[in-house]
């Protein structure tokens, strides 16, 4: 209803389209899960060291084509746009229901509720690109691998853990990637 196919390709396009009709685009910046999207395709990295206990992170790098400060500037530009709102999933859904939100970075767990509200205007697309250091950078999903959670109160918790381990083992991750 508010967004065209070309609008959803870039964060700039999303914000311009939403702003033109006084609406919001949302994303939860209080969560590292979501914030990773801005660092994932920049050449900056994080992970677990070989000791399996400590970690490394070079998101504050000062060398390379994309620096940590470049991402900071990109985030500030998005945050200062009146059409952007950083909010939790609960607040995102409230905005969907009251009509103030026209797009958001969220997960499949909200899809059925959004479809109920937006009906035929509902759509899901890949993450947009964003402007960083004068280039369009494709936003990334968190590390690009499959994760599974198991309900701790499951009647068959041991079997559920084994199934989750099998779905997410290295061999199956590679099959999914290929």
Outline where the language-model segments fall.
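Short beta-strand and adjacent tight-turn residues that come in two discontinuous sequence segments
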Residues: 27, 87-88, 105-107
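Short helix-loop capping/hinge motifs at secondary-structure junctions, enriched
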Residues: 2-7, 45, 153-160
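Extracytoplasmic/periplasmic solute-binding protein
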Residues: 12-60, 101-103
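Extracytoplasmic/periplasmic substrate-recognition and gating elements
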Residues: 116-177
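Short helix-initiation/N-cap motifs at beta->coil->alpha
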Residues: 9-13, 84-98
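Paired acidic/hydrophobic, glycine-rich loop segments that form the ligand-binding mouth/hinge
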Residues: 102-107, 123-125
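Glycine-centered hinge/linker elements that transmit conformational signals in sensory
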Residues: 15-20, 53-88
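Non-transmembrane alpha-helical segments in soluble domains
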Residues: 15-19, 36, 72-79, 93, ...
